[in-house]
Amino acid sequence: MRPLLLAVGTFLIGTDVFVIAGMLPQIGDSLNVSVSAAGQLMTVFSVGYAVLGPLLAVPLSRRSPRVALTAALVAVALGNAVCAVAGSLPTAMAGRLLVAAGASQFTPHASSLAAALAPKGRSGKSLALVTSGLVMGSVVGVPSGTWAADVFGWRPTLAALAAATAAVAVPLAAGLRGVASQHTAQRPRERFAALRGPLVRMVLTVTIFAVIAEYAVLTYAATVFAGATAGEGSRLAVLLFAFGLGGLVGNFLAGAYMDRPAGRRLVLVSVAGMTVAFLAMPQLSGSFPGALVAMVLWGVTGWMYAAPQQHRLLRLAGPAGPVAVSLNSSVIYVGAALGGGAGGLFLGQAAPRWLPLMAAVLCASAVVTELRLLRKDRPTEPAPAPA
């Protein structure tokens, strides 16, 4: 029951992160600002998540999982409630900042707890279950939320999201009663020393290469696949839905193999697979069937590294695991911003169909870094028992 509640929580977080994008025109009209000004709500969230994630993770990691996770969900619920009643853009921005504070803590602490409570040899599957909530949020939650905003309005939709988040916080708090923090005894200096290690830095380097590559293409997907969609939004929606379904498959495969010896190479398979997908994209993006194949391949490989990266950081960082995962989340948001910027600069110099080749180069850099990491991070074999 606990892993399922954690997955429901990450589903709501995943929905909350992206659903606001579909509401920007309505929010702008309601608050008497332009759509571009309303878009600052996305910027505030991203910056808040990236900055507050590691900062808040340090004090919250000393608390019990019950306190940390409940506080995170309450912050998300309150932030959405503030947005739902906001009469001005600054008030709505304050609400999104509160949502960012809570969201930045829920996912890393949920991941850490899922791994800690899992039976021996099943921590990877538990992590993948939690991560599946994020994938489902983008595949199902975001389209549903956008539809609800069109039918009922953006304020009732955010209010409903706030109520749903608060409703999950209640059984989660009850289910985690008596679950103590795993690392309350260590001194802060000892607990966070692992974050300075070269292996942790290499893991984060792989993440940022991969994320910059993905968001360089994802941000401009409508332009890259214009030949396949002929400018029709419905066709683009199908391509993005296919990407999301591929993500579900990739996350499932990660969960199935993460606890096996072959799980060491999941991230390598992921970034290498993305390299292939991006290299093939210029040839496939001109037709709708070809674009569909490219998006499914990208979705499968692109979502295959998320849970294994968290799994590896929790192992390498030890007591500072939640902080390391939070730092990884911050790197993702920084990489997303850099990817969008890099993609825009590239499109100013070259045709859109060649943008995936830039992403392929970045993914190839992730492959090189991952190969170096695998050579340095070799699992230790248990010492043989004395005769």
Where are these regions (language model features)?
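Conserved MFS/SLC helix-loop-helix module at the cytosolic interface between two early adjacent transmembrane helices
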Residues: V51-G87
